[in-house]
Design a protein with these regions (language model features):
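Acidic, Ser/Pro/Thr-rich low-complexity regulatory regions
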Residues: 2-135
Length: 135
């Protein structure tokens, strides 16, 4: 059974929320974020077009609508550009294969370490059968 984060974990979380982002890091982060989001949208568009091309009965329409609704909810949960959570967002995107660490090249080591740590945490949660929130 998973335990709640202890005081040390909360200190780390507080530190992450207050990371300082330089102008150059903000530009790198924005570019990587937009790149991953664009890939996500292209995948949704591709699948929606495939589904639309195969519509033969009314239930197929609702399947498409359901897919689009769920895709939007997932994207809205995942893609959050607030700097206070951005390292977690990037960690999740790397863990899910939607972004590579190379695409974050130029971020400070403090941010990269936070991103790696979160990706690693998500991996451990998956190993024990827990599904992290947000996707």
């Amino acid at each position: 059974m998973a335990s709640l984060p202890g005081p040390k974990s909360r200190d780390v979380q507080e530190m992450i929320r207050h990371l300082k982002w330089s102008h150059a890091e903000k530009q790198i982060a924005r570019k990587a974020f937009e790149l991953a989001l664009d890939r996500e949208f292209r995948n949704v568009i591709r699948r929606a077009k495939d589904m639309a091309g195969n519509i033969e009965q009314p239930t197929d329409l609702w399947d498409l609508e359901h897919y689009l609704t769920e895709s939007r909810k997932r994207i809205d949960r995942t893609y959050d550009y607030r700097y206070s959570v951005l390292t977690d967002v990037f960690g999740r995107l790397i863990r899910e294969g939607r972004l590579s660490e190379k695409e974050l090249q130029g971020l400070g080591e403090d941010k990269l370490e936070s991103i790696r740590s979160y990706a690693k945490l998500l991996g451990k949660l998956e190993e024990v059968g827990l599904k992290p929130g947000g996707s």
